[in-house]
Every structure is written in structure tokens, then in C-alpha cells.
Amino acid sequence: MTGPGPEINKEEHPSSPGKKQITYNSIPKNANLIDGSTNSSKRPIEKYDKRIADPTKSYFPHSISRTPRRKYTYILVLTSLNGTFESKHVVIPFKPDGLKLGRPVANSNSSSSSSLRGGKRVDSHTFSQVRSDNGNFDSRVLSRNHALLSCDPLTGKVYIRDLKSSNGTFINGQRIGSNDVEIKVGDVIDLGTDIDTKIEHRKISATVEELFVQPLLESPIFENEDSDDCHTITEKEEAAAITSHIYGDSNNLELEEVILGSDTEILSGIFINNCIGTSPTLSNIIKTLAMEIPFSKCDNFKLQSMENFLINYTTHLEYTNKLLVEKNDQQLVKLQNGLRRKLSGKYEKIIEQNRNQVKQLERDHMFFKKSFEVKKRRNNEKQKSMEREIEDLKTRLEVERYKNSQMMKKNKQKEQELSTASKKKTTEHDTRGVPGMNPKGTDKFSIKNTLCNHFTLLTFGTISIGIIAIVFKILSPN
């Protein structure tokens, strides 16, 4: 996206043999135009720097060496970690310049008054030198030239280095030397070491809270506006400055200096040796044309690059989409295969476990079935034996009942015989009337013996019947 360099016509002017004719029909080669597709958090630094390579120095013998005007500056915000200072917003100069950090130099000639601040007496001159926008700190453990902050104009990185201080400079607890060390947001910077608990003898401990770019775009001055309002930078102007820097807008002060040099450089080369009058209007027109021509070509180059980018984007969009679809399909196939393998292995394990469980259940079923058949056969045999015993006991019971009934009949017959015999004896006794004889006594004795015999037989029969009934009840099935 860079255009060709300035074309130098080395043919001498006919009326001025000592001058060289310069035609500004393009921008310099090393004026890098930044593409708008960058996503860097910091604003990119233009690679063109007059202090590094300025092709116009060899062609403008009357040019004045001066520091190029920049459209931005870096702001560093430091916040105290031990309450030794208030938050500072300092501007970081570009190399080879730098911002010194240290203790302010006391002015012995001025009769300054003293005041109390934070419980200690502070000289008013020293206090005036310690501000929130400079690198001075009110601490006696710091050297006057303690450390140096600087910014690289090419990379935009902020560096710090120690200036051979007595108590040292520390970054995140590591002491640094005289070489540049990059600092970033969140780093802890310690200047010096604690000597005493007093505030003036404590080290400066700070953290890099923020590091941002501040655009230096001024508002346009109108006739009906105040000067204070003209120097205020609105949010729209800051956004315009950032956009201008990212997309390489034509309002580039460095290109303007390259094109025009000093105010009268081009005009002196064109008109002075030709003895042509240089009116202010003609001078302004020529300067405007000299500025607008390369800026217009720069815009054309940017438009061409954007057109090429859009053509390439639309050309490769379909191919990129196809590649993405193929990649997604391959990834999907891989995921499906992996999932299938994982699930198949899992299901195979589950099926194998179920098969083993079924086989175990079948074995248990056969075992229980066989044991049940054995128990059933044994129970049947026991039942048959018990039935035979019951039948045997039943026959015995019938026999005993029959015997008992026969004995009862015999007992009744004997009782009847005894009763009849006793009646006969009583009648005989009454008829005989034998004195001194008591026949009733002998009859009573014989009757008692007969009753005892009958009772013994009855008891024996009852006990036999009870024993047979108990055995029958025990051996009978449920």
C-alpha cells in the first residue's frame, strides 16, 4: 500500500544552475500507511521518522533540522502503594529524550517559607516542584537523578532504566541496571528502599495503573469562538485522531513537513532565481497544490488497496467457506467415530455383564430345581411312612377300643353277678339269724376288691387311648 518515492529531477534549472528542481508527485517510500484491519490495543507507530531516515535532507540544502511534530503522546498513570505520593499522570517523551524520576533539587537562593503537610514540615519550594504531572517525589531515599522513563517511537513500548542511584530501582521486586527494561500495566515500580518509618525516609512504591495514548489534535479556530474553547479536545476529535492515524489520513504533519520543508523553501527554488514575484496568494496556491497532489495520490493508493482487499476477500470467501465446511465435516466424522467407539465399547461391556448374570441365574435355577426335587422326594417318602404308621396306629386303636368294650361288658356282668350274690346273702342272713356273725362285713370287702380291679382296668384303657391319640396327632400331616 506504499507509493513510490519522490522523483528527483537532476536536470538543472536553465536560469539557476546552482538549484535542483524537485517535483512532488508521490509520497515517500518509507511513509508506511497502516491498514485498518489491525486490532492492536495500542495505536500503531508510523515507521516513517525524520530522525531516522529523511530523504529530503540531501535535497533541501536550506532545510532546518527540527523535531517532527507528532499527533499523539503516551500518558503513564502511577498509583502509590504505600501512600507516599498522590497519583501521577506523566507524559513519556520519545527517545532519545526521557523523563527523569527522582528527588527535586532544592533552591538555596530563594527564601522559601515552610508549611506542614502530612504531619511533617515541607519547604514550599520543594512542594511546588512535586506535582502530579512530573517525575519528582518527596522522599530522601531517592537520588536527584534516580531513574529515567522513555518511549520507543517505532514500537510504542515504554522503558525504564536506573541512573546509577544509591538505593536502586526495582521492577516487580527485581533490581534493574542501566539497561532499558520494558514496563507494562500492572507492574510494580519501587524507587529506593525503606530506611525509617517516617514518610520522608520511605521508598516510593507505585504500580502502573494505566498506559494510554493521548491524541494531540487541536480544534479548528473560528472567528466567533473564544480561544479557550478552540483548544479543547472533544471526544469526536479524539476518535477522529485515532481513525486518522489507523487509516493513514491525509492530515499527516510529518508528510506536510517533508513536502514543504520550511515555509519558503519550494518558492525560493522555483521563483527566486527566475526573478518572478512571489505574491502571498500565489504562494498559498502553490503550497496548497504541492500538499494536495501527494495526499490525493495517497488516498488513491489507499482506495486501490482497499479495492484489492475486497476483491481478494470476495474471491477467497467461497474457497474459505468450502475449507471450513470440509474441516467441520472431518471434525464431525472424527467426533462421530470416537463417540461410536466409546458407546460400542460401553454397550458391549453392559451386554457381557447381562449375559453373565443370565447364565448365573440359570445355574442357580437348575440348582434350586434339583434341590427342590430332592426335598420333594424325601418329603413324599416321609409322608408315606407316616401314613403307614397312622394306619397301624388306627388299627391298634380299634383293637384297644374293642378290648376296652369287652372289658366293660365283663365288668358289668360281674357287677350284676355280685349284686345278685349280695342280695342272696342278705336274704340268707336274715333267715338264718345266726348270732355273733356279721355277714355284711365280708360282703363289703369282696365288693371293694372287685371295684378296685375294674377301676384299674378302666384307667389302663384310658391311658392307652390317650397315648394312641397323641401319637396320631403328632404323626398326622398338617
UniProtKB/Swiss-Prot annotation:
Q: Which residues lie on this side of the membrane: Cytoplasmic?
A: 1-454
* Compartments, record wording: Membrane
Keywords of this protein's UniProt record, alphabetized?
Answer: Cell cycle, Coiled coil, Membrane, Transmembrane, Transmembrane helix
**Name this protein carries in UniProt:** Factor arrest protein 10
Enumerate the Extracellular topological stretches.
476-478
Q: Check the record and name the Pfam families matching this protein.
A: FHA (PF00498)
Q: Subunit info?
A: Component of a complex at least composed of FAR3, FAR7, FAR8, FAR10, FAR11 and VPS64.
Q: Where is the composition biased (Polar residues)?
A: 22-42
Residue ranges of domain FHA in the record:
116-176
> Mind telling me which residue stretches traverse the membrane in this protein?
455-475
Q: Does the keyword Membrane apply?
A: yes
Which ranges form a coiled coil?
342-426
Statement: the UniProt record of this protein carries the keyword Transmembrane helix:
yes
Q: Which gene encodes it?
A: FAR10
CDD domains of this UniProt entry? Answer: FHA_VPS64-like
Q: Name one GO cellular component term.
A: FAR/SIN/STRIPAK complex
InterPro entries per UniProt: Cent_Immune-Sig_Mod, FHA_dom, SMAD_FHA_dom_sf
